[in-house]
Amino acid sequence: FLSSAGARAREDKKTDRELVKWLAEQPLQREFLVGGKKVLMIHSTPWEPRGSYIFPHSEQLERFAEVEADFVLYGHTHAHLARRVGGVLVVNPGAAGEPYYNGDAWRLSSAILDTVTEEVKRIDFPDSRYPATA
């Protein structure tokens, strides 16, 4: 949205200028501790080039093992993922707003991460904009 590709959307008269300003002021990533465990939240990847699409089958997924965190929460692809890569639990909750087509149906999803047990619960829900398949 903030890249040159999002210029048209930013200029749309329905776009809230204050929200765009707020978004531009946000950091690219957030790090924090939960119960002594380090969590990294990022939209796409913490390495260059930013904005890479890391799908569950992507070879670059292994690069998350280099991240100094116990958990990495990322998005961008809208494809749900919960996988340990090296010592890092990598989670993509999917998408609650714009669905992902997994080959047989459009899926909306979210995830709950238990930082104590390190279990990830996937929550799927229907998108009324698309007919039910599968």
Residue ranges: model-predicted function:
Residues 1-71, 77-80, 84:
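Conserved catalytic scaffold of divalent metal-dependent phosphoesterases
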Residues 12, 16, 70, 104, ...:
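Acidic-enriched, low-complexity/disordered segments with a strong bias for Aspartate over Glutamate
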Residues 38-46, 89-94, 122:
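Active-site-proximal beta-strand elements of phosphoester/diester hydrolases
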Residues 47-48, 97, 127-130:
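Short, surface-exposed beta-strand-loop junctions and turns on beta-sheet-rich folds
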Residues 51-54, 101-102, 129-134:
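A short, polar/proline- and glycine-enriched secondary-structure boundary/capping micro-motif
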Residues 55-117:
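Conserved beta-sheet core of the metallophosphoesterase superfamily
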Residues 118-134:
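A short C-terminal boundary segment appended to hydrolase-like catalytic domains
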